[in-house]
């Protein structure tokens, strides 16, 4: 995790949580019993690739499921992190290192188009996982991680999603 101290991390967590809570109540007032970066009930259990994130209730297309949270890094700090698979580049000078335990969104696995039922949505410097299809309780929540990640981490071991053709970026679509 580089040089970010525990104290700094918890400060970031508190700030992030407060904002997420406000937004959460605005968007979905019935979620007050959920952890504050959760907008919908989710479960973590064995999924497509290791642990996965599952819908704990029916989720409608367009609804926000969960916020992707973590330690906020600037460009310089992000460049020093070479061990995390959970870096999410929000913009040129803001990267979220989502490898922290309290970022439940990190459990959502990748799926190639059109097998995903969610997408990552950047809003005002924050990252939300949003449903792009109606999702039934018990379904695994899957979204396209993007070309760069797929090329680096998924293509070498082979994608496990149910797509007939996997999108391995530069190499183009490759069949199973
Ligand atoms: Zn795939």
Regions flagged by a language model, labelled:
Residues 2-12, 17, 112, 117-176:
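C-terminal SET catalytic tail plus cysteine-rich post-SET Zn-binding segment of SAM-dependent SET-domain
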Residues 13-119, 174-175:
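Catalytic cores of histone-lysine modification enzymes
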């Amino acid at each position: 995790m580089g040089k970010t101290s525990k104290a700094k991390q918890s400060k970031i967590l508190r700030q992030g949580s407060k904002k997420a809570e406000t937004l959460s109540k605005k968007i979905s007032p019935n979620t007050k019993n959920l952890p504050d970066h959760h907008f919908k009930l989710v479960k973590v259990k064995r999924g497509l690739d290791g642990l996965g994130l599952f819908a704990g209730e029916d989720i409608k297309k367009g609804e926000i499921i969960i916020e992707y949270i973590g330690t906020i890094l600037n460009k310089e700090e992000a460049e020093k992190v070479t061990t995390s698979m959970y870096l999410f580049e929000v913009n040129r000078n803001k990267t979220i290192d989502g490898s922290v335990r309290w970022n439940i969104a990190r459990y959502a696995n990748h799926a190639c188009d059109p097998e995903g039922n969610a997408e990552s949505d950047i809003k005002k410097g924050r990252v939300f996982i949003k449903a792009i299809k109606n999702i039934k309780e018990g379904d695994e929540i899957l979204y396209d991680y993007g070309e760069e990640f797929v090329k680096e981490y998924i293509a070498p071991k082979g994608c496990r999603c149910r797509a007939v053709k996997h999108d391995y970026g530069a190499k183009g679509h490759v069949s199973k």
